[in-house]
């Protein structure tokens, strides 16, 4: 009898332990499903959360970035693919060619002055021609021009390529003496941009005559189809650090692609004499991450458009 009781107790204990293990396994399995469901829900909500978290706050300009600097003697740093290509051509093609020509001409002048003056050469040479020299000074300029022309044509072709599919359209209108930025792909709203008073520009950390009350806000890393026109006289939309310049002519739409590699504030000015206050038409282009741009569009009463993934 005691042996039977012990066996019965062991059986009950084993069954209860198995039941408890099964309950724990079921609990873990249920918890795993809950965690997986929660993770999936968070993953699905991530874009919406990111969009909700993205808010537009005017970016502070960085000293020396996208604007002129005191004592500057060369091009501004470039923040567009076209600008970087042009800067490479200037640094690695034009400057070496110019330096070589200047040094060659200088050396030849020194040699001629030293060897063929009246004291060193009292009897002048009566040589009428030199075939080798004539061939050299004919072929050398041709080769030099080819070395300059080929990359120049490629650079010009890249500057005027048509806008790719999905590019954001921004229409720039030049007025006397301010700018208007219209966003047709985002509902067609227009932003009017005037120069800040010098004291207000300094307070915001911007250079006088460059700061604007409203900037042209665009997404960084996304191709921009920039269209320009003039409402009254001819203006010119120019931003040196983006290697961008396009005339704004009344009654005509000019178009060019703009691509900005990095977020930041980039300054320019009207580059076509347009009247008494021509010198007071600053341009401030602010490139921001795509979610921030979409938040800015909503703050202007516009609708975000479907854009390609930024290349930044």
Predicted regions and their residues:
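N-terminal secretory/membrane targeting signals
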Residues: 1-54
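Alpha-helical transmembrane segments and their helix-start/interface "positive-inside/aromatic belt" motifs
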Residues: 27-39, 91-95, 134-138
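Non-transmembrane, membrane-proximal soluble domains of secreted or membrane proteins
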Residues: 52-93, 115-312
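Active-site-proximal cofactor/substrate-binding loop regions of enzyme domains
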Residues: 98
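Alpha-helical transmembrane segments
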Residues: 102-116
């Amino acid at each position: 009898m005691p042996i039977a009781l012990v066996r019965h107790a062991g059986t009950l204990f084993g069954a209860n332990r198995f039941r408890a293990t099964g309950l724990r396994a079921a609990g873990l399995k249920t918890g795993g499903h809950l965690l997986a469901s929660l993770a999936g829900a968070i993953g699905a909500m991530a874009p919406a959360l990111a969009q909700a978290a993205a808010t537009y706050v005017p970016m502070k300009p960085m000293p020396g970035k996208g604007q002129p600097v005191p004592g500057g003697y060369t091009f501004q740093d470039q923040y567009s693919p076209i600008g970087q290509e042009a800067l490479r051509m200037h640094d690695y093609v034009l400057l070496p060619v110019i330096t070589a020509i200047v040094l060659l001409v200088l050396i030849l002048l020194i040699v001629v002055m030293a060897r063929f003056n009246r004291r060193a050469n009292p009897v002048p040479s009566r040589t009428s021609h030199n075939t080798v020299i004539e061939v050299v000074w004919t072929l050398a300029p041709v080769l030099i021009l080819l070395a300059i022309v080929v990359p120049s044509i490629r650079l010009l072709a890249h500057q005027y390529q048509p806008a790719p599919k999905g590019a954001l359209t921004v229409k720039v209108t030049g007025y006397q003496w301010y700018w208007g930025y219209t966003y047709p792909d985002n509902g067609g709203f227009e932003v009017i941009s005037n120069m800040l008073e010098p004291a207000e520009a300094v307070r915001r950390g911007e250079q006088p005559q460059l700061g604007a009350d409203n900037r042209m806000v665009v997404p960084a890393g996304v191709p921009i189809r920039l269209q320009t026109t003039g409402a009254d006289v001819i203006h010119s939309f120019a931003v040196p650090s983006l290697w961008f310049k396009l005339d704004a002519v009344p009654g005509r739409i000019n178009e060019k692609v703009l691509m900005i590699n990095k977020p930041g504030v980039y300054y320019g000015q009207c580059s076509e004499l347009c009247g008494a206050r021509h010198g007071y038409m600053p341009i401030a282009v602010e490139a921001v991450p795509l979610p921030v741009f979409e938040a800015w569009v909503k703050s202007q009463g516009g609708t975000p458009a479907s854009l390609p993934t930024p290349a930044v």
